[in-house]
Amino acid sequence: MTKFIFVTGGVVSSIGKGIVAASLGRLLKSRDYSVSILKLDPYINIDPGTMSPFQHGEVFVTQDGAETDLDLGHYERFTDTSMSRLNSVTTGSIYQAVIMRERRGDYNGGTVQVIPHITNEIKERILSVAKETNPSVVITEIGGTVGDIESLPFLEAIRQLRKQVGRQNVLYMHVTLMPYIASAGEMKTKPTQHSVKELRSIGIQPDILVCRSDRPIPRGLKQKLSEFCDVPVECVITSQDARSIYEVPLILEGEGLAEQTLKLLQMEQRQPNLEKWQAMVQGLYSPKHTVEIAIVGKYVSLGDAYLSVVEALRHAAIATQGDLQLRWINSEDLETQAPETYLAGVDGIVVPGGFGTRGVDGKIAAIKYARDRQIPFLGLCLGMQCSVIEWARNVGGLAGANSAEFDSTTKYPVINLLPEQQDVVDLGGTMRLGVYPCHILPNTLASKLYQAEIIQERHRHRYEFNNDYRQLLLDSGYVISGTSPDGRLVEIVEYPQHPFFISCQFHPEFQSRPNTPHPLFTGFVQAAIAQSHPTANFQTPVKVS
């Protein structure tokens, strides 16, 4: 029987429920339990695919093409398990499903209500994850904060589910804040007490409290929370601020979170195997070489817009013993200032994905700077398209070359709409999404990095390289190193007369993991370190020359 763990949050938003859920998943998996993690988001959007990155952060794409919350990226990276569209549920998708049933007449003329129809649909979504993959444990994170009106149907559904599947098969975990008041010189339990009171008024008694704090919580305060919140003192867990999110599983293991979870769910206690994770964290905290990477993007005012890119760079830095320093550059600034004003001194340049014409010329300027100055460059999705435009304009002799997305009247549309996108009207969920195979050509940088002929990568785009210009770019020295298996779609391009210059149409950042960094990122960071540390000795199998 699958066990169900529900993670709620109180006191403040952005308290770190996703990291707690992902960390618990890591701890259970280290004990050889299979885990799937589900996110319930209370917003009315069907999915985050059409939401602004400035509001929502990045859109994380699963293997099966679902556009999901960035927390699913944490789930995948921490548990090293691929999630699917079943692992992401929004209020909008719940209401859409119920309303479609009502329109079909499935409710036989009955009045459709939040209880039972909406709550039943929520419960069915949770149970479907267990049915699909039959994991030992399904961890469900409920978005928002207890007390928010938007979250009430989700909380009611998980309250009902305990009776439905059996009390011994459900655990409620509440993540709260324990603030330290400097003027009083003490930590305060009252916010947590009130948050638990709010949760109990809904009918949910938490089994475990995970208390976020910037310092250790004294035993006396844990005892106080135990008495006021009716939780065993050993189930009051400190989640102290860490230097890195990857240290959190180790902190929670030291607090006994997994042990208490297994005890409450009546599961077998097993010894954890966290040696590789501990070694990874140790590597993160003991770098040998400083490496500064510029991220030239359109949404840099919100770092979460490029969360998976940053984490993939971090994974690669760990593998290459690099101390990663990021220089965030708004691509619009490069449209009015010389690139060296912002890019001078960086060891590598990443141009990530995005949509729309704003800031594109700045991205193209950054790419030209990287190519001219022999600075390692990695282009992702839109970054790949911009690299093709830059080459076509400045090397291929196609003055004014552009993407049809940015200029529908351009004389040289080197990037064009995918044929299957021609008649698409709706924006949501209609792009080329999810995993597609890619054939790697031999004797290329891509083949040296991947060490494989066929790879699988995740996509999210409507536009592609225009094959009408394939031969022209090849003749001018550009190399196409990855295509769809039928050779029709160009997926990877590179410039061989350069220390490291490669771009891909897909999003490799979505498949990078702390202990298995993505080869494109590892090769890129290694090349960037070599810029400022030519004698660096890398303990990594990646060879880029």
UniProtKB/Swiss-Prot annotation:
Binding, CTP: S13, D148, I149, E150, K188, T189, K190, P191, T192, Q193, K224
Binding site for UTP: S13, K188, T189, K190, P191, T192, Q193, K224
PROSITE patterns with a match to the protein in the record: GATASE_TYPE_1
One Gene Ontology molecular-function label: glutaminase activity
Glutamine amidotransferase type-1 domain segment(s): 292-534
Record-listed Mg(2+) binding positions: D71, E141
Region entry Amidoligase domain, spans: 1-267
Coiled coil feature spans: none
Active site: C381, H507, E509
Binding site residues for ATP: S14, I15, G16, K17, G18, I19, D71
EC number: 6.3.4.2
Keywords: ATP-binding, Glutamine amidotransferase, Ligase, Magnesium, Metal-binding, Nucleotide-binding, Pyrimidine biosynthesis
Biological processes per GO annotation: 'de novo' CTP biosynthetic process; pyrimidine nucleobase biosynthetic process
Regulation: Allosterically activated by GTP, when glutamine is the substrate; GTP has no effect on the reaction when ammonia is the substrate. The allosteric effector GTP functions by stabilizing the protein conformation that binds the tetrahedral intermediate(s) formed during glutamine hydrolysis. Inhibited by the product CTP, via allosteric rather than competitive inhibition.
Transmembrane annotation, as ranges: none
Gene3D superfamilies to which the protein is assigned, alphabetical: 3.40.50.880, P-loop containing nucleotide triphosphate hydrolases (3.40.50.300)
Pathway it works in: Pyrimidine metabolism; CTP biosynthesis via de novo pathway; CTP from UDP: step 2/2
Catalytic activity: UTP + L-glutamine + ATP + H2O = CTP + L-glutamate + ADP + phosphate + 2 H(+); L-glutamine + H2O = L-glutamate + NH4(+); UTP + NH4(+) + ATP = CTP + ADP + phosphate + 2 H(+)
Binding site for L-glutamine: G354, L382, G383, M384, Q385, E405, R462
Recorded GO CC terms: cytosol
Pfam families: CTP_synth_N, GATase
Subunit structure: Homotetramer.
Role played: Catalyzes the ATP-dependent amination of UTP to CTP with either L-glutamine or ammonia as the source of nitrogen. Regulates intracellular CTP levels through interactions with the four ribonucleotide triphosphates.
Record family assignment: Belongs to the CTP synthase family.
Name of the protein: CTP synthase
Organism of this sequence: Nostoc sp. (strain PCC 7120 / SAG 25.82 / UTEX 2576)
Taxonomic path: Bacteria, Bacillati, Cyanobacteriota, Cyanophyceae, Nostocales
